[in-house]
């Protein structure tokens, strides 16, 4: 018994749709975190992407001892971590301000003000760990005997 035209038509249609879906699909695209890291590399002189792991991208720059970009944590959407000497140089503040302006889409002077305020507040009166909020960014600065670090995040709901 031969298959009638009513059975062939749906089969051909399904095969054609599967073929279009296979070849017509867009190519795989890098996620937003990798795009942000590439944009940072293109915009900031001396910045290099060193290692990409899961949701952390480690970066290198002469002004910072450590520099990383974290994406999609439990409580934040994007995180910028940087570490420098105990008394950071102005180049470090410029680096964090430039990176913060690109990542969090805020003006560079605002990012510079927030990061420098956070790091400069550490001392005898406020201690070696300072948490503050500036322009909808959460900043946490910590200091040891030899180095200072800053973590800049934006919450998921903002």
Residue positions per predicted region:
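Sec/Tat signal peptide C-region and signal peptidase I cleavage site
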Residues: 24-30
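Long, charged/polar, surface-exposed segments that mediate recognition or autoinhibition
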Residues: 72-122
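Bacterial N-terminal signal peptides that target proteins for export
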Residues: 2-15
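Secreted/processed peptides and extracellular or luminal domains of membrane proteins
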Residues: 39-40, 77, 124, 147
């Amino acid at each position: 018994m031969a298959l009638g035209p009513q059975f062939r038509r749906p089969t051909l249609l399904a095969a054609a749709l599967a073929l279009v879906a296979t070849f017509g699909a867009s190519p795989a695209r890098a996620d937003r975190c990798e795009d942000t890291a590439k944009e940072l590399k293109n915009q900031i002189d001396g910045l290099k992407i060193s290692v990409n792991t899961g949701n952390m991208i480690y970066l290198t720059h002469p002004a910072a001892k450590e520099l990383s970009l974290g994406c999609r944590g439990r409580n934040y959407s994007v995180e910028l971590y940087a570490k420098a000497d105990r008394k950071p140089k102005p180049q470090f503040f410029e680096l964090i301000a430039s990176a913060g302006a690109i990542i969090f889409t805020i003006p560079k002077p605002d990012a510079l003000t927030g990061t420098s305020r956070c790091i400069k507040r550490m001392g005898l009166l406020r201690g070696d760990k300072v948490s503050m909020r500036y322009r909808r960014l959460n900043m946490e600065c910590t200091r040891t005997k030899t180095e200072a670090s800053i973590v800049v995040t934006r919450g998921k709901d903002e």
